[in-house]
């Protein structure tokens, strides 16, 4: 070893080394830079990243050796974590220089290491997982996670309706604000429809030079804005109670109607001939079947307990479900005629 060091210090050896370096064929191994940000060559960054990966693989294989004591295992595990951080620095520098992003869409070179990550992202490999205190650390972490999940579940288990906003409408202020906003938007949309129809009629009219001022549009030709086809707003609690009451009343009514019908015959099912083909037993002298007739003294019709219809579930009346009235052609023509009369009165009479 001493002889090799002496050779390296000789004048001829240093001359050959300088000559090889100038030609770009130096055989002396270069040391890896301490800072990845100091390298500005993408090719060099790729090279040093590969070098770090090879070193990580070598140390991960070495940490599996059962001949190592606990101190050596801890030192190797620390070195592996340092190399992993250094690999991340080189990957960030590669991305900064416009290279590939190795952190995205690339599987881990160490496999799935879930459950072996300590605090601060510190990882344990090989025999380091069996070190004293490491198993207890992972067991306590799992217990803490289970405890936090249970605590979160119990915290949100018995929340009052006010937490979800179900009691915001009880004071009536929110319903009043919503009703006012609905009326304003309803009026705006209605008059937009009216103005659109008026412009369509004016485009087909010969008098294209008629222009109405803002003051003339106030009357709107006697057209009134219809009310919103909906019942008066009520709090959510009252609406739910009304629906429950309507369902209960409909069910009781159906049940009473079913109980009031006469009792049917004791047989579970009437004969097929009596139910479907009564004309087979009634024939005239020529042998032709007599058409069935409805007798007043016939047995009462059978009624079954049918489920309530969809209308029984609704809290709206039939009038509430009617579409709002929309001005037709006659109403629009009346509006235009009144506006034209008003314009002529102001032009010739001044009133």
From Swiss-Prot:
Localisation: Cytoplasm; Nucleus
InterPro entries assigned to the protein according to its UniProt record, in alphabetical order: Helix_hairpin_bin_sf, Isy1, Isy1_sf
GO cellular component: catalytic step 2 spliceosome; cytoplasm; post-mRNA release spliceosomal complex; post-spliceosomal complex; Prp19 complex
Domain of life: Eukaryota
Disordered: region residues: 202-241, 254-327
UniProt subunit comment: Associated with the spliceosome.
Similarity comment text for this entry: Belongs to the ISY1 family.
UniProt name for this protein: Pre-mRNA-splicing factor ISY1
Organism, scientific name: Mycosarcoma maydis
Classification lineage: Eukaryota, Fungi, Dikarya, Basidiomycota, Ustilaginomycotina
Gene coding for it: ISY1
């Amino acid at each position: 070893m001493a002889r090799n060091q002496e050779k390296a210090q000789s004048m001829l050896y240093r001359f050959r080394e300088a000559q090889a370096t100038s030609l770009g064929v130096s055989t002396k191994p270069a040391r890896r830079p301490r800072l990845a940000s100091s390298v500005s060559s993408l090719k060099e960054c790729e090279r040093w990243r590969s070098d770090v990966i090879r070193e990580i693989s070598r140390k991960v294989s070495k940490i599996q050796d059962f001949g190592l004591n606990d101190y050596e295992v801890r030192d190797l595990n620390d070195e592996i974590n340092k190399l992993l951080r250094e690999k991340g620095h080189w990957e960030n520098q590669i991305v900064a220089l416009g290279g590939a992003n190795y952190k995205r869409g690339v599987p881990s070179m160490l496999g799935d290491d879930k459950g072996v990550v300590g605090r601060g992202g510190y990882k344990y490999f090989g025999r380091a997982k069996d070190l004293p205190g490491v198993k207890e650390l992972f067991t306590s972490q799992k217990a803490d996670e289970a405890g936090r999940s249970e605590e979160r579940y119990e915290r949100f288990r018995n929340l009052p309706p006010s937490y979800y906003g179900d009691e915001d409408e009880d004071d009536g202020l929110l319903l009043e604000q919503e009703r006012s906003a609905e009326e304003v938007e309803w009026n705006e949309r209605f008059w937009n429809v009216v103005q659109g129809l008026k412009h369509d009629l004016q485009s087909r009219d010969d008098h294209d030079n008629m222009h109405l001022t803002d003051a003339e549009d106030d009357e709107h030709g006697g057209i009134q804005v219809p009310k919103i086809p909906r019942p008066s707003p009520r709090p959510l609690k009252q609406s739910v109670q009304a629906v429950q009451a309507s369902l209960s009343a409909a069910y009781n009514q159906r049940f009473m109607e079913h109980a009031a019908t006469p009792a049917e015959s004791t047989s579970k099912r009437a004969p097929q001939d009596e139910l479907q083909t009564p004309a087979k037993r009634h024939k005239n002298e020529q042998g032709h079947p007599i058409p069935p007739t409805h007798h007043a003294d016939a047995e009462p019709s059978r009624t079954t307990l049918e489920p309530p219809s969809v209308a029984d579930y609704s809290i709206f009346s039939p009038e509430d479900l009617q579409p709002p009235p929309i001005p037709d052609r006659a109403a629009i023509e009346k509006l235009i005629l009144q506006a034209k009369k008003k314009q002529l009165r102001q032009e010739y009479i001044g009133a």
